[in-house]
């Protein structure tokens, strides 16, 4: 069932021990497996107020969303419009898919070629290894799937409802940052948005390996449905904190593109997933991305970042991961004119 994580771990360990020249790129300071961190509950926002509330309640809700995006880069939403029945079915279907043998998963015909991923192909050291597996599924794979299985119908329901929630939140954030809220309907299309189903198997070396390496998301915003195992951590006030699972909430986090588009008003925060020695963890995420040719440009007369297309951003991230083993991200696009 599991990918050959131990084999990869042992190969990386052997390479580190026998390597005579230290040419492994240094990873930023936050890339270290730490001991105990404080567990906190993210801000919780009842987004039903955006639809059903009076004008004053809607404005309070919008401000709460913007404030959490400025101060945390992460928040939770309840009464979000995605039923617990859909979420539970999504989890059950996900578990069933990951229970298949590794060889079958890696050659799966359920999704397009290359959808199944595991570990960190670019890893040159143990600290760059992610002890997890995933199915990376473009929205078009879901909507174009004519094989009406329980999996495809459940994914379509989850994806379409996540998409609606993402548009609603993005338009609120655009309004509160003085940007054009119609940008998302015009530019965030199904062929670049995607779902990612994640599984984090039990790891025998939890003090040495991440479930998912520290990173920021290369999108506008992410909607995450996770189980109650825990393991998600993020940076707040220059320290790592653990996110306390909330069974009634979805987690929302700001991506790199929103940080650049809002001129740094909203924060794309570094986060990671820790491993667990005994219990597996499951999550499903929806990533809101623009078309590849969409230009990320803020309306400020003193932009912190230069204009760039989503295609250019992706290519730069891929080049950095290949060269260094980790993503550099937005610092590559800082505007040095000011």
Curated annotation (Swiss-Prot):
What's the EC number here?
A: 1.14.11.13
Q: Where is the active site?
A: 281
Give binding positions for Fe cation: 215, 217, 271
Q: Does the keyword Acyltransferase apply?
A: no
Q: What induces it?
A: Up-regulated by auxin. Down-regulated by paclobutrazol.
What UniProt keywords apply to this chain's record, in alphabetical order? Dioxygenase, Iron, Metal-binding, Oxidoreductase
Catalysed transformations (reactions):
gibberellin A1 + 2-oxoglutarate + O2 = gibberellin A8 + succinate + CO2
Binding-site list for 2-oxoglutarate? 281
Q: How is the cofactor bound?
A: Binds 1 Fe(2+) ion per subunit.
Pfam families named among the record's database cross-references: 2OG-FeII_Oxy, DIOX_N
Its GO CC terms are: cytoplasm; nucleus
List each copy of the Fe2OG dioxygenase domain by range.
191-290
Please give the superkingdom of this protein's source.
Answer: Eukaryota
Cofactor(s) recorded for this entry are: Fe(2+)
| Alphabetized SUPFAM superfamilies for the sequence | Clavaminate synthase-like (SSF51197)
Its UniProt pathway annotation is:
Plant hormone biosynthesis; gibberellin biosynthesis
Q: Name one GO molecular function term.
A: metal ion binding
What Gene Ontology biological process does one annotation of this record name?
gibberellin biosynthetic process
UniProt key word Heme: no
Q: What does this protein do?
A: Catalyzes the 2-beta-hydroxylation of gibberellins (GA) precursors, rendering them unable to be converted to active GAs. Hydroxylates the C20-GA GA12 and GA53, but is not active on C19-GAs, like GA1, GA4, GA9 and GA20.
What family is this protein classified in?
Belongs to the iron/ascorbate-dependent oxidoreductase family. GA2OX subfamily.
What PANTHER family has UniProt attached to this entry? 2-OXOGLUTARATE (2OG) AND FE(II)-DEPENDENT OXYGENASE SUPERFAMILY PROTEIN-RELATED
Q: Report what the protein is called.
A: Gibberellin 2-beta-dioxygenase 8
């Amino acid at each position: 069932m599991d990918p050959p994580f131990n084999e990869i771990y042992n190969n990386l360990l052997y390479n580190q021990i026998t390597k005579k020249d230290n040419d492994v790129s240094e990873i930023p300071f936050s890339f270290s497996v730490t001991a105990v961190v404080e567990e906190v509950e993210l801000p919780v926002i009842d987004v039903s107020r955006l639809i059903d509330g009076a004008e004053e309640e809607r404005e309070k809700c919008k401000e709460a969303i913007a404030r959490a995006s400025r101060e945390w880069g992460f928040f939770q939403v309840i009464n979000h419009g995605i039923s617990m029945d859909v979420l539970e079915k999504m989890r059950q279907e996900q578990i069933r898919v990951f229970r298949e043998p590794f060889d079958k998963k890696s050659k799966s015909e359920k999704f397009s070629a290359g959808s199944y991923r595991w570990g960190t192909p670019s890893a040159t050291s143990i600290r760059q290894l992610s002890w997890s597996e995933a199915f990376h599924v473009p929205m078009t794979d879901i909507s174009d799937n004519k094989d009406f299985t329980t999996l495809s119908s459940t994914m379509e329901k989850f994806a379409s409802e996540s998409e609606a929630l993402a548009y609603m939140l993005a338009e609120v954030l655009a309004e509160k940052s003085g940007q054009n809220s119609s940008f998302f309907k015009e530019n965030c299309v199904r062929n670049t948005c995607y779902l990612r189903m994640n599984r984090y198997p039990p790891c025998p070396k939890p003090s040495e390996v991440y479930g998912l390496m520290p990173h920021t998301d290369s999108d506008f915003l992410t909607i995450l449905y996770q189980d109650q195992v825990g393991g998600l951590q993020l940076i707040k006030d220059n320290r790592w904190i653990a996110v306390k699972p909330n069974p009634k909430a979805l987690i929302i986090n700001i991506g790199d593109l929103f940080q650049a588009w809002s001129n740094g008003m909203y924060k794309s925060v570094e986060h990671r997933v820790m491993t667990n020695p005994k219990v597996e963890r499951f999550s499903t995420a929806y990533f809101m991305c623009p078309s590849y040719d969409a230009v990320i440009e803020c309306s400020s007369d003193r932009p912190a970042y230069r204009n760039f297309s989503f295609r250019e951003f992706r290519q730069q991230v891929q080049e950095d991961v290949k060269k260094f083993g980790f993503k550099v991200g937005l610092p590559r696009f800082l505007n040095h004119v000011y």
